[in-house]
């Protein structure tokens, strides 16, 4: 569950205050405009957890579809549906459904409308390295938390400057743990099924359903 919250929380933001690098701020504003123009989007990603001291190197695939305050997240074999009022966490392996209220989740749950927007609040922005691959050019922006008590040392946000898309997010913890989110694909304004964000209870008749 913590990993799911990490994936969601990776994308949260509003507006940043402080002495930001002008080039970094300008590039991120361009990305923000593209994100804000979309009514919905679909993201396929790879999540990697690394800690050399602990010998941890784990890769996991996932996807999320967002439409305003609704979302459908598939990650670690768990499906999470939010219909803007309730969050339904479906664990097929345990034949279990956990239902919680968006309102009750409070600050622990990031509003889907804020996904892909985490860099707008709480960070100092610094222009960083340019990574050139065979198929793309990724410009990294370094984000340093303003909160000195943060467990995060810094973030590296990779922007595909040819497609104006977020490509990669690297989080460096003060405990030397690295979490990497590689965005494999972003589709803006995808065609959505009317039931994409609807929890259909009849499909889970044999499941244990818990209301928090």
Each language-model region and where it sits:
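A generic structural motif
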Residues: 46-52, 74, 90, 144-146, ...
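Extracytoplasmic
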Residues: 38-40, 59, 68, 82, ...
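An acidic-aromatic
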Residues: 61-110, 179
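N-terminal leader/targeting segments and the immediate start of mature chains
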Residues: 16-56, 69, 203, 208-212
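Sec-dependent N-terminal signal peptides
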Residues: 4-13
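Gly/Pro-enriched, hydrophobic low-complexity segments
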Residues: 123-130, 134-204, 208-210
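Flexible, surface-exposed loop/linker segments and immediately adjacent secondary-structure boundaries
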Residues: 102-137
